[in-house]
Amino acid sequence: MNEKMSFSQLLALSLMLFALFFGAGNMIFPPAMGQLAGTNVGAALAGFIFTDVGLPLLAIAAVVFANRSLDTMAGRAGEKFGRFFIILIYLLIGPLFAIPRTGSVSFEMVVTPFLGADTNPLIFSVIFTAIFFTAVYFLSANPSRIVAIVGKVLTPVLLIAIFIIGLTAVINPIGPLGEPVGDYNTIAFFKGMVEGYAAMDALAAGIFALIVIQNVEAMGIRQEKNIIKYTMLAGLFAAMGLAVVYGILAFVGATAGPLGEFTNGGQLLSAVSKHMFGTAGMLILGVAVLFACLTTAIGLTTACGEYFSDHFAKLEYNHIIIAVVLFSFVVSNVGLTQLLSITVPGLLMVYPVLMALVISGFFDKWFKGRQPIYAGILIGSALISIPNGLEALCATYGIDVTAMSNILQMVPLYNLSLGWVVPAIIGGILGYIVSIVKK
């Protein structure tokens, strides 16, 4: 049987996956990173792309080769761990971090630029996010073609706006590349790698992979090798698109020095848009971002509602999305900068474990499904990632944890944000020994 997908079908599939990945965080983190990286923006961008393009692509592959099952991939270290980790991922890309961020970014891009310096933004934020999340609830409770239409129309508009800003920045840059700040002076690649965590695409990649696989099968592709082939091609093309957009946004941030310093990427992009195209340009970009964020929020809310209602019989879909929307509304009003400062420590705890899980999955042929090996790898990575996240959280709130920091600095590669690697390898070796003894 000669199964073949047309180019237009593959392009549509790739654009769909790109749109799934391209949310609020993808807009604000690259320019903010570029602003701090300055002349080292290339190295920082490479690190960012490694964790926010490369790792999601690996995660898609890991799910595809794990019998196209998220449960299989996550459950290799144990069924209970697998269930716990999947729930944690849904909470992180749902009401804890990603959904609230869509409201915060929308407010930052659409409303904040028009507020006076003496205006209290909280009142306006509460009103705006109340309207935003009410819309999210009704569109999630009543799935409609409006969401698909908005996604198909607004994503291209947003991309066109980004490319126009990027082209203008290249032809007529606002200023020269700035000077690197802090760790961007010495370890720009590894600093960019950690910044890539914040977009959270790798967390969602496994879920998105299942959506792509469903669409591939809906296009009449049935053979296993062809499902793998077209899913991976869609992932590759989407990844290439993300890398190009990140490069544009990072360059814009790196050359925006004359406009001043900004506390987050949303403020920076608004200022750049206003500088290049005036208030109208800033408003057009803001509205495009608003609808992109709205579409993302609806998709994530729906995903959370479907997962928890399917896996927990006593939970009703409508009750879940109400809880998700209300919690997201409250969290979104802490402010974008504050929300980001809380997000990073949490991701520092989770991402190394996810990376260990994804990478180790490619060695299943040699591990032969031995659960103790996977458990050892994940425990080893968590022994460093959790203290690392706690250290970052304490630093955010000015809590002195010098003793813990001194101990962590003794771990190989810790200063490069790769302190989890050696403990994960040691844990895997110990797990292998345990599996041999048990056998």
Question: Where on the chain are the PLM-derived regions?
Answer:
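Select transmembrane alpha-helical segments in multipass membrane proteins
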Residues: 6-17, 42, 80-93, 126-130, ...
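Hydrophobic, membrane-embedded alpha-helices of multi-pass small-molecule transporters
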Residues: 12-22, 166-175, 184-249, 281-293, ...
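Hydrophobic transmembrane alpha-helices that form the core helical bundles
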Residues: 32, 82-116, 293-310
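Membrane-water interface regions at transmembrane-helix termini and the short interhelical loops
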Residues: 65-73, 131-154, 218-221, 330-342, ...
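Hydrophobic alpha-helical segments and their helix-loop junctions in multi-pass secondary transporters
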Residues: 95, 99, 159-184, 202-203, ...
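Membrane-interface loop-to-helix entry segments
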Residues: 139-169, 344-355, 374-383
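A generic transmembrane alpha-helix motif of multi-pass inner-membrane proteins
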Residues: 172, 181, 370-439
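Extracellular/periplasmic helix-exit of transmembrane alpha-helices
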Residues: 240-268
